Amino acid sequence: MINKGSGTRKIWKWIGGIIIALIVVAGSVSVYFSIRWKPVLTQKIKDVVYNGSEHLYTLNFKDIHLNLLTGSVTVDSILLAPDTAVFNERKKSGTAPTHLYRVKLEKLQLRRIEILSIYFKKRIEMNDIILEHPSINMIYNKVYKKPTPVKDRRSLYERISKTLKSVHIKGIKIEDADLDYVSGATGMILNSVKHLNVNVKDLLLDEHSKTDTTRFYYTKDISFEMTGYHSLSKNKMYTMKVDTITGSAIGRTVHIRGFKMIPMYPEIQFSKMLKTQKDRYDLAFDQIDFKGVNFYRLNIRGILQAKSLRIKNANAKVFMNREMPPGHGDKSQNFPHMALKRLPVESTIDTLQLRGVNVAYTEYNPISQEKGTVHIDRLTGNIYNVTNDSTSLSKNKYAVADLDAYLIRAAQLHIRINFNLLATNAAFTFKGHIGKMDMVKLNPLSKALGLVKIQSGQVQQIDFDVKASDKGSRGTMQMYYNNLKIELLKEGEDGQPAKKKGLLSFLANTLIIKDENPSKGKPVRSADIVFERPPGASFFNLLWKSVFIGMRETVGLGIIPMKSPEEGRKVVVKKLEERKEKREDRKQENQDKKQNRQEKREKRQARRAEKKAAKEQS
């Protein structure tokens, strides 16, 4: 038994000795080859970048660490930089790329590399590359493609084929990157992104990968994710927030979740800071989805092209303070199709899908001192051919919106808008249908903005057909209704509610208001819509004012002339001055009362002092 145990121990000693010897030999070989191959690998990597980019990029780093046992490489203090001289030469020849990249990072990891394959087989094979918290400058340049008699049409593989036979990387990860989008012309940062993650799946560069239609730029996919985007608008009046943005090149998708544009100040305070009448926006979009995005075209030509853009579960609040003086600009330039022209990126969206969008347009009336809101809830439908691309416009110059919604929380609305995308006068047409509605539900709007209270009235349907432009609108309306009665109001003062104009209300209902359409025994009346648009009127204002005028004409109020914007502004200014004078009068009155009370107190104190002195003398 003793001899058997002693033999077993000897065997284990031999095994242990062999293992230790192998480790020592392997370690020695690893150290030797690391020293021997380090400069070779260093030069190979630099050559791949330099030759593969046609001398446009150079790669430099402080040091490289090799571990042949694990097949890993760690590179310290890396800088990938473009050669501006080469880029400028390419601009002249019309071969310069739209974007340049400048990348800095402290450490780069390359794992599971087959080191010997690089030297003996001229093939790079590795498991993955990891870039942790890099700083990336993406530099946009407006470049022009010019025909040139001498052009290198070789593929990327053909350019490196003298150095390498293939490059195969199973994965590339960029983790928690900071990305600055920079103007090449000015050097200004156009946008900045933090916490960006990028995943590149299965990069293969060989003689066949160029023609592989399942790949995007030699990869099986390039996906990205960005979380917690936050920025302040240039005028510092809004905060922009996005929860997440994700996308996939092969899937041709971009998904945005939790987009918000938040005003920095409350409605009235916000409007007074802008000095003139300007819209205040408060936006919250839960889901924004692009599908069918052409990433090739976006990267090469800077053109956004997508099959669809879907906006789902969104709230858009717009506020206008009519107390402020009108600005000098013309808001027709902010009409949807005019704003589309000004986009810095050429864009074509085949179909813009709206699903469950709630819009609230609010105006503050300084005469009534109340806010009136037009609610358009559950807006759903499609807008076709949303484009500012000249090629697309040459084929079809119209964008068509076909939409359904719940109007002012009282009736169903269907509207079709036809935008002329080439019109210089913002021309468009719209026609629609409004279903059954209890007109009393219009009171929150009519009381605040028109000082009219509806006592009763039932709408069966409204049909309208309108042509519009930056000058205004012209059209017709047929409104079927009955049992209409109203009250005319006058504004309250000092925060008091509006009061009824009794006699005028009676006269209006008796002599002016037509309580039904069609009237008994008569055909249905059609109303003409004529709206002269003031320069300060927004697109939404033009829509609802046109419909409002048609309703006004139908019920008989058309014989009462409407004030022009200038006249309306004079009334507002006069009313504000009157209120200011009253406030000053009340302030002076309060000061006088306070002074009188003070004088009375002083007299009482003087009398008490006299009595006290007389008493002491006696």
Model-derived regions: residue spans:
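Short, surface-exposed polybasic-and-hydrophobic patches located at secondary-structure transitions
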Residues: 126-135, 147-155, 159-161, 189-204, ...
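Flexible, surface-exposed loop regions and adjacent strand-edge segments
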Residues: 143-151, 324-329, 450, 492-499
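N-terminal type II signal-anchor transmembrane helix
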Residues: 2-55
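Flexible beta-edge/linker motif
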Residues: 39, 47, 52-143, 157-185, ...
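Flexible, solvent-exposed coil segments and beta strand-coil junctions
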Residues: 84-91, 148-157, 223, 265-272, ...
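Extended terminal
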Residues: 2-18, 420, 433, 446, ...
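Interface amphipathic segments
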Residues: 205-250, 256-270, 370-450
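Outer-membrane beta-barrel translocator domains and adjoining extracellular loop/strand segments
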Residues: 88, 142-143, 267-271, 322-324, ...
